[in-house]
Curated annotation (Swiss-Prot):
Subcellular location: Secreted, Cell wall
Purpose: Polygalacturonase not involved in the final stages of pod shatter.
Protein name as catalogued: Polygalacturonase At1g48100
PANTHER family the UniProt entry points to: PTHR31375
Enzyme Commission number(s): 3.2.1.15
Active site (record annotation): D282 (proton donor), H305
Keyword Amino-acid biosynthesis included in the entry's annotation: no
Main location per the UniProt record: secreted
PbH1 repeats: 241-267, 268-289, 291-311, 321-342, 350-371
Any Gene Ontology biological process: plant-type cell wall modification involved in multidimensional cell growth
Residue stretches of biased makeup (Pro residues): 41-50
């Protein structure tokens, strides 16, 4: 009886232990499968997430008829290699039709990918890639994409003001490890382009030259990983967009290439520009009217004309810009650093600007507000102006080009700049020991800490006419 009881106890203990180890083993090998088709782009450290854009109009279910499958398509039904649609990729043949056909095919399916593969040099003429498209569309550029070489090769029927246009898209990504080559040299050499003389002066005459990449009336756009270079004019432009993320791109053109702004924003909201390098012949980043909630971090800028807000208020127009942040950025060998420029006679406002943790290296006009911006010698004096207020400069350090004072606040005679805050600003001459005095005109603000050079020219308090301005010019 005792032997039987012992056997029964051993059996019960063995059963319990076996069940326990089985559950442990199952727990070790249990996993959660990710959702199919969901991508997780690397978050740009350290910026906060962008604000959620307002939902756009509903996208039609099938904007393009499905084309017949092209021979040699990828095993994935969602990847449309342009070479399968007839692209040659030798840098000489016109591959425009192949890109248009691949776009139509990818646009018609969810998570479609237009692929320009590595090793190809694809030449296409001025093209509008339009939507609406199915969700998740990607243009993957791993080769080289370029326009015709100069104005003489540009087709007569094509628009000379733009080359690649992305229009009416939502949830679109332009990415890859490839290069967008602008072939800009012959455009820069046109006699109507501004050219800088040996004395530093320039003569200008407007003439049509294409912006290389333009996003127009689109939402939730991402551009990442690309190299964009030698644009005839602006490298990348966003007009009427909302929800833009630009991450880990390189933009480059020669220092004296005219009008080659790196990234230009106009009437665009909720923008993040992160971890990128821009060197060019004009503004690194320019922010025009109608822009708000722009976050710029981790950018290396220069040689260039710096980071600019404006020009604003031209031809007596109203301009509204607000909530712009520039942090953790380097500006080097540039004609300007952090600039706000407005024309006389405009209305509206520029407000809530934060410039923080900026390193300057041999920069002319490190900090500048210019409310007398003019591109000729005959601009007349006017009483109205775009109001500039609530501007913070924090931890701005480095060296400046001694040809101009490092701090310059030239505010309107009638519409003062107000609530300017300076904290931990230390700017020393790149050459020599003489520190230039800042310039202030009708600028109100405060120093939270001592600055180098000392900025004793800021006025205390607020101007008497402030209330009258707010009732007439507010955005």
């Amino acid at each position: 009886m005792r032997r039987l009881s012992g056997i029964l106890v051993i059996y019960i203990i063995s059963t319990v232990l076996f069940g326990h180890f089985t559950n442990v083993a199952r727990a070790r090998y249990h996993y959660h499968k990710g959702r199919h088709g969901v991508t997780h782009p690397l978050p740009p450290p350290p910026p906060p997430p962008l604000e959620t854009a307002n939902p756009p109009d509903q996208v039609p279910s099938d904007p393009y008829p499905s084309p017949d499958p092209a021979p040699g398509d990828s095993d994935s039904g969602c990847v449309f290699d342009v070479t399968s649609f007839g692209a040659v990729g030798d840098g000489s043949c016109d591959d425009t039709a192949a890109f248009q056909d691949a776009w139509k095919a990818a646009c018609a399916v969810e998570s479609g990918v237009v692929l320009a593969p590595e090793g190809g040099v694809f030449k296409i003429t001025s093209t509008i890639f339009s939507g609406p498209c199915k969700p998740g569309l990607v243009f993957q550029l791993d080769g080289v994409l370029m326009p015709p070489d100069g104005p003489e090769e540009w087709p007569e029927k094509d628009n000379k003001n733009q080359w690649l246009v992305f229009y009416r898209l939502d949830g679109f990504t332009f990415s890859g490890k490839g290069t967008v080559e602008g072939n800009g040299q012959k455009w820069w050499d046109l006699p109507c382009k501004p050219h800088r003389g040996p004395d530093g002066s320039s003569s200008s005459g407007p003439c049509a030259s294409p912006t290389m990449i333009r996003f127009f009336m689109s939402n939730n756009i991402e551009v990442k990983g690309l190299r964009i270079q030698n644009s005839p004019q602006f490298h990348m432009k966003f007009d009427g967009c909302q929800g833009v993320l630009i991450n880990e791109i390189q933009i480059s053109s020669p220092k004296l290439s005219p009008n080659t702004d790196g990234i230009h924003l106009g009437n665009t909201r909720s923008v993040g520009i992160y971890n990128s390098v821009v060197s060019n012949g004009d503004d690194c980043i320019s922010i025009g009217t109608g822009c708000s909630d722009v976050d710029i971090q981790g950018v290396t800028c220069g040689p260039s004309h710096g980071i600019s807000i404006g020009s604003l208020g031209v031809h007596n127009s109203q301009a509204c810009v607000s909530n712009i942040t520039v942090r953790n950025t380097v500006i080097r060998d540039s004609d300007n650093g952090l600039r706000v420029k407005t024309w006389q006679g405009g209305t509206g406002s520029v407000s809530n600007l934060l410039f923080e943790n900026i390193q300057m290296e041999n920069v002319l006009n490190c900090i500048i507000v210019d409310q007398y911006y003019c591109q000729s010698k005959d601009c007349r004096n006017e009483t109205s102006a775009v109001k500039v207020f609530d501007v913070e400069y924090r931890n701005i350090k480095g060296t400046y080009d001694v040809r101009s004072p490092p701090i310059h606040f030239a505010c309107s005679d009638t519409v003062a700049c107000t609530n300017i805050t300076m904290s931990e600003v230390e700017l020393l001459p790149e050459e020599g020991e003489l520190v230039d005095d800042p310039f202030c005109w009708n600028a109100y603000g405060k120093q939270e800490t001592l600055t180098i050079p000392p900025i004793d020219c800021l006025l205390d308090g607020s101007p008497v006419v402030e209330e009258a301005y707010d009732s007439n010019y507010g955005c």
